């Protein structure tokens, strides 16, 4: 037998300890670095979302926002708002005046229709005056010539021909037979259009008309409907820019025109911005743009606004206005119901697998299926929920066939069930065997031992699974897309009265805005606001579960 002699190197144990210490420090550093990287990644990803989402609550609200809040939600001081509306209307009036004067020479169809209307009204006026037949015939013939000459001037793109036709109209301005009649409108229109002819390039009238339409649209988006106009049916068209950031985008659209030009032959077109002053150079509309630029603040009166009601208000006009109250309530309902469905079933399943089933082939197969179920794509759960809960099962119990909170909660319950089973199973296994042995030694049955000893001791670990399940259920979109979600909804009260109806949720509404027609570009603050609200809601639910878990753990330790 060969005996190994003890080491005669007195430094070897010290070297091993130093090596082990160095390895420990390396792994500790790597672990700390990983944690820092994860924290940094969270900050990089979440900070911009939370920052931009906060603009849904804290922003500079304009007078249009205060008007919308008063009319739709009954908030604010009506008398102060009325005074404010009068003040901004006075500042805006010159804008409408400049638009009207310029558009008279551009909207030729309106001018021609006005000329025809004057001709008809003049004929009716002659009938009411009982004008002699011969004089009536002469005056109607004269009015017809005035109408035709004015129409010829309007339709002409040659300045000389237009001035000549207008001259034929104004030649009769001093005719005493036309004094005090409707026909004087021809002379007023001829003088106004003569000024247009002097200042506008008639050959570019079609180009001016298109650009004028863009200017009108931008002004309408800024200030809302013009005073005296019919109220638009869509809520989003009833008000101007309700926020200063929205107003700045509309101001840019008003003050600059976007054009796509070919810089080099054979190369893709490039977008350039042309100032509106350059686009309307030499016309009476040029002063409008510096006027709006300099007095935009007076026209909209932006004020710092803390819109905390964003979290309780119903959405209006497809999330264009309003808040996320129904989305928060729908998310809470469907998440809580899903956990209520999954938690008892998950704990019972875990208890059976640990306490009763042993470790045979069937049990190993069941565990494999549970692990596989945890990796199934959520869209598959959504399709299963549609086929089984929505179409087959719930109608069998008298529920209406269709999407509902109940169907969505059952589907999400199946989705998070593997998470709860695995977490509960590990929590039950982690309970020291001495707890169970002591209870059984005192004469407790296996069921009573589990309910009174094992389950309370495993509760902190089970709550860990609940925390993970809440985060998963609240953020899912695909399953509720088929089983529970609608794009727009209102707050139902009491909440349990709506379990058989579809609901809107934060996750699905964020998706709906993102894929909607232009809505994400028009109101990005609402999309980020929904994401921020979802993050905060999940964080609050997780913190609540963590506090409950901590309290349970302290009670188990006797603190």
Spans of model-derived segments:
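Membrane-interfacial helix termini and adjacent extracytoplasmic/periplasmic loops
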Residues: 51, 301-322, 357, 362, ...
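Membrane-topology segments of multi-pass transport proteins
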Residues: 1-30, 50-320
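Cytoplasmic-entry segments and transmembrane alpha-helices of multi-pass inner-membrane transporters
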Residues: 24-28, 345-385, 422-423, 557-559
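Transmembrane alpha-helices
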Residues: 423, 446-484
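Transmembrane alpha-helix signature in integral membrane proteins
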Residues: 29, 36-40, 322-351
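Interhelical loop and adjacent transmembrane-helix boundary motif
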Residues: 318, 481-535
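Short cytosolic juxtamembrane segments of multi-pass membrane proteins
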Residues: 549-559
